[in-house]
């Protein structure tokens, strides 16, 4: 209960305020919820243990949390950089994405799962040279999203 009161509630309250402020200021918002995932699905992580993951999994909860043009933009940027990308499989998006995604109100929320093999040795947890390339990819993605029109 302590962690919920001290961490969960304040975090979600701050995120709610940030999303609302961005939507008021810009007429819409594009929220990207980033996570890391192992190169291969673990026994308890998904319904598909042993499944090799692509470089990225985009989750829009089957199109309910972001407009198609926003999801397509993210996929296009990542594939243009040579990455493998899956949509909603095996991760559709978590509660934060559901809570903040409402495309009819120009509020787009996507979960972005990033394969750890892109930036670290999973066995040692040491970063490797791929982390610089990943940083550049993420910079390009953020720039593309900054120029996207959430109200389209």
Protein language model regions, located:
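Surface-exposed cleft-lining segments at the edges of enzyme active sites
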Residues: 1-8
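Aromatic/hydrophobic pocket-lining residues that form the small-molecule binding cavity
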Residues: 8-11, 15, 134, 138
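Catalytic cores of processing enzymes, dominated by hydrolases/peptidases
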Residues: 10-120
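His/Asp/Glu-rich mid-to-C-terminal helical/loop segments that flank catalytic regions of hydrolases
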Residues: 122-152
């Amino acid at each position: 209960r302590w962690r919920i009161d001290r961490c969960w509630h304040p975090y979600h309250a701050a995120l709610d305020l940030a999303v609302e402020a961005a939507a008021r200021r810009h007429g819409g918002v594009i929220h990207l919820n980033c996570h890391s995932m192992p190169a291969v699905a673990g026994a308890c992580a998904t319904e598909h243990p042993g499944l090799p993951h692509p470089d990225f999994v985009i989750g829009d909860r089957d199109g309910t949390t972001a407009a198609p043009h926003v999801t397509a933009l993210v996929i296009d940027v990542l594939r243009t950089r040579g990455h493998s990308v899956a949509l909603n499989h095996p991760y559709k998006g978590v509660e934060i994405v559901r809570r903040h995604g409402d495309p009819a109100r120009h509020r787009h929320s996507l979960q972005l799962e990033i394969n750890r093999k892109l930036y670290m040795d999973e066995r040692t947890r040491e970063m490797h040279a791929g982390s610089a390339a990943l940083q550049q990819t993420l910079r390009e993605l953020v720039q593309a999203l900054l120029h996207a029109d959430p109200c389209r």
